[in-house]
Structures are given as C-alpha cells and as structure tokens.
C-alpha cells in the first residue's frame, strides 16, 4: 500500500495527516500552537514551537497509523502563508518570533509605500495590494527593529522564509533554503509574471537579495529529510501555501473553478489557468500551485476573521462555552432578528481593504438575545464570502469568462450545515462539500504524489474527488439581494472614520 504524509502547519495548530493513494485519511495528529500577542494588532508565533510541534505530530501520526517510515512514499508540506521568519544560517536559530499573517505592525510602512506611489507597481508585478498582511513589510520591520539584523543580513548570515522554508530548513538539517511559487507569491516581493524575486521591489523595500530562498514549482523534488528525524530519509515532493493547496486538493484545475476554505479566516480562490488576469474589484492575483515550470494563476479574496468570530464569541464575549454550541444556538432562532455583525477586528480584507475598519454589531433591540448575536456572527462569515465571490464573478465576466457556477468548500467551519445553506442562499449557486474536507493537507499530498509517480496527472486526481453534500439555494434572489444590501450598509458603518 502507498501512503503519503502531509505536514499541515496552520495558524492555530500543527497537524500531520497520512493519506492512502485514494486520498482517504488514514490518521491525523495535531498539536495546538501558542498565540503570542505582544501589543494590540501584533500576532507572533515561536518558530521553535512551530518546528517542534510539527515534528511531534509527524511522529505521532505514523504511530497512530501503525506505519513505518518505509511505508511513506513522500511528504507534502502546506502552511499558513505570509507568516515571516528570519534566522541565522549558521546556527539555525531564529532572530525573532515569527510575525504572523494577521499582524498589523507594518501598516505605517505600507502607508509610506502608498505615499511614494508604489501601489500600481506592486500590484502589476505581484498581483497584490500594498498591505501589512504580506511578508515584505514584515521582513523589513524585522531588519529595521531587531538589533544587528540588517548588518547580519547584508553579510549573508541570515535567511528569510515563510513557514514552508523554515520547516524544510529544519527537516533537512539546514541543507536547503527553498520555497515554492505559491508561497513566494504572497510576499509582495515576487514577480508573478517572471516567476522570480523582483530586484526592483527588493531594492524599494531595502531588503538584501541574499536573504531570499530559491523558488521551485509546487510539485517537484525539494529535498530529502534528515534520516534521523523520522527514521528514514523521505522525499519532500510537494509544497504549497495553504489556500493554493486547498484549491489543488479540491481538484479545481480548470479556469473558473472556485473553492472557499472556512478556517480562522476565509479564503476564496478561483483558478484562472495560465492567464494572469488583473482584478478590477479589489481582489488579489496569486500564483496557483504549479506542477511544472509553466505558471498557473488564481484570483483570491481573503477574509481576515472567519471562524475566528466563533472563537471571539467563546473567549471574548463569553456567549458560548464551546465552539460546537454555535450552530444549535443560532438554529434556536429563525433568523438574526435584524442584527448584523461585521467582525472587522483587524480591519477588513478583500474586496474592501480597509485597515482602519473596526468590528460593529448593529440592529440591536430590547428583543435581541445571545442567539441572535450568535446567528449574526455565523452569518457574517457567509456575507464576507459572498461579497468576495460576487467581486470574483464580476472580474471573470470582465475577462470574457462566466460567473462561478458552483463553490466547493472545505475547512473546519464547512461542517456547519446552517452556514453552508445560508452561503448557498446568498450566492444563488450550489455550495458543494466533498467527502474529505481536509483538502489543504490533501492538496499537499497530491502534489507530493504527482512529483514522485504515485499519480500520473490531474485527470487521475479529479476522479478521486467525491461529493459528500450539495447545498442548493432556497432563498429567493430578491431576498438575497436585499440581505447583501443590508450587509454593505453595515460595512459602511464599520469603515466610517
């Protein structure tokens, strides 16, 4: 039997999943990751905790699956994107905590870049908007604020990487400093047209080129692991940022196919094939997972606070004791009772891109209960995703394509039937949940399997993808449009300054 090991390093946890060659889950191991909040708007992770937790889950999952290292054909890696690490090449020690994608400390630097007229150049070269979300300004902050970092970087003593690079450095005992195109495309330093680091952007952000990892296609041989770590040297055959990996795991291989991952944030991606189509509706252009040197692209919309709104209900508002309660509480009322929540706790992402927006709850009356607020919180995830898909469809039509015909879904919150049905109602298209919702890890496994001969091509992978449930719209379009209009009014209140 052939098995593939996916290392899935996420924002809230490190996980490892073993899949068989049919894409079925054999075993899962998980360890929570400590969230560090030094100041309001700052979010960090301990790089050594990232590494040790990921290695521990890899060992745990082999034990759970009752497999030997020799049973694993290849390893695939998928990871939280944009999170920025800087470490010493000689010692392998990080010079600072990892700055997480949610972190907003680099916003003043982004404002300077906008004032310098860099917005159009950065969007044209990278497909991204100037935002503290991406790695480039986080890296610049580290160079400017960690004592001695800039001098060390200019001497070639430091290495920059996103989480995938950091894990591969550790997995190989410091032998490789590499990333894949999908992760590189999220740095605001990578030219998505030329598939290489952009010298002009590195210069504009005052980042030494010696810091940067080499870049490979997502499905390729990156390295072999140090045999001492897992009992045998195993090939790392696939690497992709979590959202591009999920797009691949959802078998969205053709232009116009789209998926939404409902995790800490929500991430909606539509494959655009070999065309690097610009967005005119506030969306990002990004590199999709590549299986060869030929570029592939996707359009992306990012929601900063998706499932995290449920965590806030539990930990911040103390409205629920556990995340599992939210569906039953929300279902105890027929609707949100006029309550609308905009969870802009860290600003708003696409298609609004307002770093100064703050969370609001509107429509409160004496009759409002905690159940109405819970339902409004859940519905806010669907509203944000619907705004993204509508923007995406407008871009697709403008480029001569057609609106998205169905939305494939995955991630932890996709198991919530109430949320999925409301999503279908707002969109007016089927929302399709696959049998395996661990599509982020599955995508990494597929990429590794492709490069090592387990699979022959994307056609074979498409046949493995199976539907668990299809949610059909039941709400009339007039009602859905009125609901979206109410959402946009609430957003305007959240973004008012």
Swiss-Prot record:
Q: Tell me which Pfam families the record gives.
A: FGGY_C (PF02782), FGGY_N (PF00370)
**Stated regulation of activity:** Inhibited by fructose 1,6-bisphosphate (FBP).
Q: What is its EC number?
A: 2.7.1.30
Q: Which molecular function term from Gene Ontology is one that the record holds?
A: glycerol kinase activity
The residues that hold sn-glycerol 3-phosphate are 11, 81-82, 133, 242
Its Gene Ontology cellular component terms are: cytosol
The pathway noted for it is: Polyol metabolism; glycerol degradation via glycerol kinase pathway; sn-glycerol 3-phosphate from glycerol: step 1/1
Enzyme class, spelled out:
transferase
Listed A to Z, the keywords are: ATP-binding, Glycerol metabolism, Kinase, Nucleotide-binding, Transferase
Residues that coordinate or bind ATP: 11-13, 264, 307, 311, 412
Positions in coiled-coil regions: none
Query: Which family does the UniProt entry place this protein in?
Result: Belongs to the FGGY kinase family.
This protein is called what?
Answer: Glycerol kinase
Instruction: Please report the organism this UniProt entry assigns to the protein.
Output: Variovorax paradoxus (strain S110)
What's the gene?
glpK
């Amino acid at each position: 039997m052939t098995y593939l090991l996916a290392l899935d390093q996420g924002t809230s946890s490190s996980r490892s999943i073993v899949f068989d060659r049919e894409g079925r889950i054999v075993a899962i191991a998980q360890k929570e990751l400590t969230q560090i909040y030094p100041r309001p708007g700052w979010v960090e992770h301990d790089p050594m905790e990232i590494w040790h937790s990921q290695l521990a889950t890899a060992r745990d999952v082999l034990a759970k699956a009752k497999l030997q290292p020799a049973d694993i054909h290849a390893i695939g890696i998928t990871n939280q994107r944009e999170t920025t690490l800087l470490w010493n090449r000689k010692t392998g020690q990080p010079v600072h905590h990892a700055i997480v994608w949610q972190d907003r400390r680099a916003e003043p630097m982004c404002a300077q870049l906008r004032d310098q007229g860099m917005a159009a150049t950065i969007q044209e070269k990278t497909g991204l908007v100037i935002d503290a979300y991406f790695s480039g300004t986080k890296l610049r902050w580290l160079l400017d604020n960690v004592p001695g970092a800039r001098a060390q970087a200019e001497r070639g003593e430091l290495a920059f990487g996103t989480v995938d690079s950091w894990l591969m450095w550790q997995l190989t005992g410091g032998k490789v400093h590499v990333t894949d195109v999908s992760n590189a495309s999220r740095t605001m330093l990578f030219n998505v047209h030329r598939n290489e680091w952009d010298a002009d952007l590195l210069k504009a952000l005052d980042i030494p080129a010696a810091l940067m990892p080499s870049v490979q296609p997502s499905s390729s041989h990156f390295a072999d692991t140090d045999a001492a770590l897992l009992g045998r040297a195993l090939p790392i055959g696939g690497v992709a940022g979590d959202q591009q990996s999920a797009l691949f795991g959802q078998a969205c291989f053709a232009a116009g196919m789209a998926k939404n991952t409902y995790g800490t944030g929500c991430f909606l991606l539509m494959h655009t094939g070999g065309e690097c189509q610009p967005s005119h509706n506030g969306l990002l252009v990004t590199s999709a997972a590549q299986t060869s040197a030929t570029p592939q692209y996707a359009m992306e919309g990012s929601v900063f606070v998706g499932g995290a709104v449920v965590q806030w209900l539990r930990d911040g508002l103390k409205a629920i004791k556990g995340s599992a309660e939210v569906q039953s509480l929300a279902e105890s009322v027929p609707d949100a009772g006029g309550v609308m929540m905009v969870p802009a706790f860290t600003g708003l992402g696409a298609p609004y891109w307002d770093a100064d927006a703050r969370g609001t709850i509107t429509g409160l009356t004496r009759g409002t209960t905690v159940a109405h607020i819970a339902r409004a919180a859940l519905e806010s995830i669907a509203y944000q995703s619907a705004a993204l898909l509508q923007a995406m469809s407008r871009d697709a039509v403008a480029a001569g394509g057609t609106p998205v015909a169905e939305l494939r879904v995955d991630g932890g919150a996709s198991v919530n039937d109430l949320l999925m049905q409301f999503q279908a109602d707002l969109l007016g298209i089927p929302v399709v949940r696959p049998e395996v919702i661990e599509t982020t890890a599955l995508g990494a496994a597929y990429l590794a399997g492709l490069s090592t001969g387990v699979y022959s091509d994307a056609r074979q992978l498409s046949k493995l993808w199976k539907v668990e449930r299809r949610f059909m719209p039941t709400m009339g379009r007039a009602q859905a449009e009125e609901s979206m209009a109410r959402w946009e009014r609430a957003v305007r209140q959240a973004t008012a300054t």
